[in-house]
Structures are given as C-alpha cells and as structure tokens.
Amino acid sequence: MKDVVEERLFAHRRDLLTRLELVFMDTTSLSFEGAGGQTLGQHGYSKDHRPDLRQMILAVLIDGDGRPVCSEMWPGNTADVTTLVPVIDRLRRRFDIARVCVVADRGMISAETMAELEARRLLYILGVRERSDKLVRELVLDHPAPFVPLVMKKRGKEIEYEAKTVLLAGRRYIVCRNRQEAEKDAADRASIVAALERQLAKGDKALIGNTGFRRYLKTISEEHFAIDPDKIEEEKKFDGIFVLRTNTDLNPLEAMLCYKQLWTVEQSFRTAKHLFSTRPIFHKLDETIRGHVFCSFLALVLKSELEERIAALGRVGSWPEIIADLDSLAETEIEYDGKRFIVRSAPRPTASLALRAAGVALPPTVRDAAAS
C-alpha cells in the first residue's frame, strides 16, 4: 500500500514537463523505546546518539524541487553504504525514470557503491571523505589547479567560496573551500593548540584520553607527548574544505549548489522527528511501525505541497506559525433567545493564508446549530 500511495502521488504531480532527474537521498536512524517490532529494531550506528536503544533506518528521497518522492525503511543494523544503489534501482523501476543524477553525502559511499554507479552509467554528485580517502588527501587537495572565486547566496546573504576542478585517475573532483569556515577552522585550531600548551605545562597525563588534543600531538615516550608542528601544518589543508566527486558536466558552482541542497533532506528529517512526532515509537509490530513512520512521510508531502502553494501566492509562511494559527481556530456553541448557535473565532493572518492556499473555505462566523 505504501508504494501505491507514493506512486500515485508522484503520478498526480507529474506532467509532460516533469522530469525526475535530480534526486537527493539521505538516511537517519529512529530509535525505539521498546523492542522495535519483530525485525526492524536492531542495534547499529545511532545518529540519535543513543547506542543503548534499538533503532531502524529511514531513507527519504527528495526531487530537485524539494518535494518528497518516496521513503525506504530497513532494520537498524543496516549500513548506509549498502542502501544507495538498491534504492536508486527501485526508484527507476517504480517511477519509470531513464536518466537520474544522484546527490548523496559521504557516508553513503564505498568503493563498491562507486563501481555499481559507474556500471549502471548513473550520474552522481557525491561527497568525499577528504581525510580518509588517501588519493584525495595526498593528491587532490595538493593539486596545483588554481582556485576560482565563487559566490553563493543563502537566505539573502552572500557566502564566499572558491573551487578548483581536479581530473585524476579518470575521476573528476571538485575541491570547495568556504572562506568563512576556513577562518573559523584556523581560529579553532589555534585555540586548541594554546590549550594544549597550557596542559603540557601542567603535565602529560591529562592528555591521554583527549582525542581532540591528541590529533596535534606526537608521542615522545609511553606517557609523554609534545606538540607536532607537522600535524598542525597538515591540518591546514582541510580548513573550510569539502570535496565532491562527480561524473556530470556541471560547472563547480552548479555542482556545489546541487550538493548544498542536501540540507532539504536533513531539514525533512528534523521536521519529521520533532514537528510530526515520529519519535518516540511505541508500536510492537513491524507493519504498524512502518505505518507510523509512513504517516510522518505523508505529513512531509502535505507540508511541502502547502508551502509550494503559499509560495505561488507570492507569500511565505513559517510552518510552526501556520500550525499555531490553525490550532487557534475554535468554535463555541451558545444559546440566545431560545436558539442555539455556533460561533467561529476569526482566523489569524497565517491561518487565513494557509486556508486560501489549500482552497479551503471556512464556515460562516455565526450559524444555526440546528442546521449543522
């Protein structure tokens, strides 16, 4: 039933101009207070920072216009890197998509995933683990290709970036640097090194369990450390940096803009978890758990549709404000001169906007209770 609803919703929105070419995918974990059904509730890597609880994994796919397309659910011990290719294969079959460009974060990627994407001739824009990927760390970041200044607008503000394209071993990388983040990273590192110097003056033992400090240390003996200037110099290359790998022909700014849109999926997860109360989940059966989570996905679809309709009116409505204003609507039954009437409260401005966008007409302010 879930698949049927998702496919019919997509078909309803689809027209001759609809092309589901750009797909954003991310996953999150949803923890359980109990066992979590017969198979879904398993211990795994917890993005909720609750490794003590059983959990399930939820993936949401969003199109290039920011609209939820479909959701997928797995047991909580499922690794992110195993989910991307099967989901994209199913997506193409279900929605009859010939050409698709996948945008996903670094946690979704492995060497096997990359090989599968290449074998299927799928377009992709993927985040890269710049610290743990040896090729990126040692060759891509140090490549002599020049950085080109870019400006990205976000919430009315201009953010300065610079980017360079590196072609290496048949792969295309885009190295991006956020100048503000680079300055912050440098300042944070200077603060840590200063704190290190103070700690070293007091004694080495306090540093043994501090992984944040030990990144910049070298071991002198079993319990003695010193600041390692080579490690500090190496860290500078990562200041404000993120790296993309893509096989598209998009220019660096276009690729960056696509990748940055992943925040829409992350925002959807936050909305589902908090505004729509996806957690806590107290259901005992897999099928009822799936139904509970799918209701949150449908709420995301409705939220997206309403926001799109409000935008079409040239207006902007805050979701918490919309909910609060709609919640303030009330009716009271009163008796006057032997007759009973229903009196409706006046809608607040944001509620009026939402109702207008949804095409919903309110009943009269005062009406005969008998007629109702």
Residue ranges and their predicted role:
Residues 1-372:
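Anion-binding and metal-coordination hotspots
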